[in-house]
């Protein structure tokens, strides 16, 4: 066991984190550069949890089957911030946000018990009613194709992808670590999708990942 400060970030250094949360154990696995790696990591994680007598589902007092409440958050990005598709192509994030806004089933089909403006992952049209009008203005300023300003997409959307209180962490599309002006640890080119509940089986989780990969590829090809 190594204690102290974490080493400087380096794409050659892979790590995973296990953190106790109220009622759940949060596991952040290392990035996967291929579908085969993601499948292997996910199946291994579920298998190790099962052997430790840990589950990804629970039953309510009335017998209803539900998730753990911990969430199955999905992080997308690149090996380095320069490789991040969301910093290279701001219109990719704009396409994903509007696609989710036009297809509410993507927000609710895989969600947990708590949805809406006061949930952990409110949609962009749930938190504030005027946000859609401001979002329209922001998207009009969004350039098409690749850009050289990595901060551009963050500045255009940081005040919109929030909850009722303006917290960027509690949003369906979390850009806390996209290109935050606050610290180096917030400029990683990462997008976190927080609207997914923990699935009961590894294959269901992989199905969700496959759907997201397909939508990202579609929006990259046809913004």
Residue ranges and their predicted role:
Residues 1-68, 79-223:
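C-terminal accessory/tail domains of diverse enzymes
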């Amino acid at each position: 066991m190594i204690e102290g400060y974490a080493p400087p970030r380096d794409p050659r250094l892979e790590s995973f984190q296990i953190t106790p949360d109220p009622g759940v154990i949060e596991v952040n696995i290392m990035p996967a550069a291929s579908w085969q790696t993601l499948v292997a990591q996910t199946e291994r994680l579920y298998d190790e949890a099962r052997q430790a007598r840990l589950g990804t589902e629970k039953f309510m007092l009335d017998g209803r089957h539900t998730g753990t409440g911990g969430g199955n958050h999905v992080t997308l990005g690149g090996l380095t911030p320069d490789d991040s598709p969301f910093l290279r192509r701001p219109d990719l994030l704009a396409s994903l946000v509007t696609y989710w806004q036009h297809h509410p089933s993507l927000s609710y089909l895989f969600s947990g018990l708590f949805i809406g403006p006061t949930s952990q992952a409110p949609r962009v049209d749930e938190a504030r009613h005027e946000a859609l009008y401001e979002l329209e203005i922001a998207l009009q300023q969004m350039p098409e194709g690749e850009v050289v300003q990595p901060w551009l997409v963050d500045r255009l959307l940081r005040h919109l992808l929030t909850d009722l209180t303006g917290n960027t962490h509690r949003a369906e599309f979390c850009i806390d670590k996209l290109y935050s002006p606050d610290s180096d640890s917030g400029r990683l080119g990462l997008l976190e999708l927080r609207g997914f509940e923990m699935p009961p089986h590894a294959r269901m989780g992989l199905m969700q990942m496959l759907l997201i990969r397909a939508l990202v590829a579609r929006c990259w090809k046809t913004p």
